[in-house]
């Protein structure tokens, strides 16, 4: 469903703007180093220091999947259709990266999608979604480490429609995929990268190097 708004003013040409959108999962406002000295999050702290920190921002729905759909559509859950952690998006939804594609952007999604669990009988939950030229994801919550599933197979990631085994700690692996995308993409087009981490969603497992940090 397209909801249009009139442009308010002229902006810098789209070809001059590259965007990296990073989402962490289930991370409270006080689980950030610049908000709580007990916590060590140097990279997020740097983003806050060099960017803007919105101190009074709220989500419209306190659930994972509806919030993810709102980010991509700009709509309330009763409009985009993702009313819980199982419902799929309405088929007529337009995700904002689709508009970026129309404007000449190269777009990529890397990480946790987690929308449409109820549609698992008709499609793979990690299938590439509209609006993205490059795709890396996994079904549902995913796994922090390579895990043997109930069918006896090891869990996999969907990389542009091809299923490959997860190799290591998921935060590091998703970050590596993002770095690879940025280093290999053509510089002739602007890009939008949506890096959607699984961490620090419960049940949280740290990387081995951080296992005894606290």
Language model region names:
Residues 2-214:
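Formylglycine-dependent sulfatase
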